[in-house]
């Protein structure tokens, strides 16, 4: 798992320093705060202390990166939790990697999309930019669930569609190889 997380950071860092898919982010000041928000992938389950993607991203970017990952979380829970995390940390940027547990549990993807949309709207209303990271469906080819592209287009987000899919298909990033 730690190789997967390290690969995630290596692929995320250039994005945070520039642009993606013709959308740009405001530069993050040295004192700026990045909120890595999501489930077990964000929390770093399976990685040693200091090896979660938020920890490695903080080291590489020299920015404050808050690890707001909650193992086992579904988007309905994340929607509520974000309203508590944002006033506590005042992030400039949110890396939103959420919905994998919804997919694994076969929850209604329309509801997942609604919860993610509410999180994005809340973040924007409170002055934070959002980078949306796509989560693969449960299928042989690990294609990203279409709701992520729809949300990215609707909210004009920087979107990383295939990051997890690409990492999951690459044996180099698997800790159990």
Which residues make up each language-model segment?
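C-terminal motif of bacterial Sec signal peptides marking the signal peptidase cleavage site
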Residues: 16-19
């Amino acid at each position: 798992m730690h190789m997967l997380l390290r690969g995630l950071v290596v692929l995320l860092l250039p994005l945070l320093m520039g642009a993606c898919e013709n959308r740009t982010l405001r530069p993050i000041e040295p004192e700026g705060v990045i909120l890595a928000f999501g489930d077990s992938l964000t929390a770093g389950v399976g990685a040693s202390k200091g090896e979660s993607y938020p920890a490695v991203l903080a080291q590489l970017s020299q920015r404050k990166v808050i690890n707001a990952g909650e193992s086992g979380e579904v988007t309905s829970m994340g929607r509520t939790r974000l309203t508590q995390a944002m006033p506590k940390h005042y992030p400039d940027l949110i890396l939103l990697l959420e919905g994998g547990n919804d997919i694994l549990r076969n929850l209604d993807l329309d509801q997942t999309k609604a919860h993610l949309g509410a999180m994005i709207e809340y973040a924007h209303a409170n002055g934070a930019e959002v980078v949306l990271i796509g989560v693969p469906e449960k299928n042989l080819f690990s294609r990203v669930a279409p709701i992520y592209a729809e949300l990215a287009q609707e909210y004009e987000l920087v979107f990383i569609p295939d990051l997890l899919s690409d990492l999951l298909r690459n044996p180099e990033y698997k800790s159990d190889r």
